[in-house]
Amino acid sequence: MGSPGAFRAWLSTSSESALARVTTGASAGRPLRLYDGTLVAADLGDLVDAGPRAAIDVDFKGVALKDTTAVWTGTLANGSDNPTRDCAGWTTRSGQTGSIGVQPKTNSQWTEGKVNEPCGASYRIYCVELAK
């Protein structure tokens, strides 16, 4: 994959959706690939319209994730925020709930898998590399 560029987390808040976060600075027609080169989506539009073409099943070092993993997103399948499901804008670990995606799902559950997860839980996050 070459040298890494800047990344943004696929996380939504009430003031900024995950899609808006990663679209800023990203090319609309740029393919999204895993660290190992596997095509995930033709572009961001494809990702939110159809979900990932391949499971997002490697970490940022290219290490395979063997088990089903929860991933913090606060994000609906269309890339918009899941209202009141963002752990108070990702600022608290108690008294709030958030929504998660489920890795290795390739349907809408990749980002919109479950709501009401306690914010104190430790889950992964998805990151998207921005265009250079």
Question: Where do the model's predicted regions map?
Answer:
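Secreted/extracellular ectodomain signature
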Residues: M1-K132
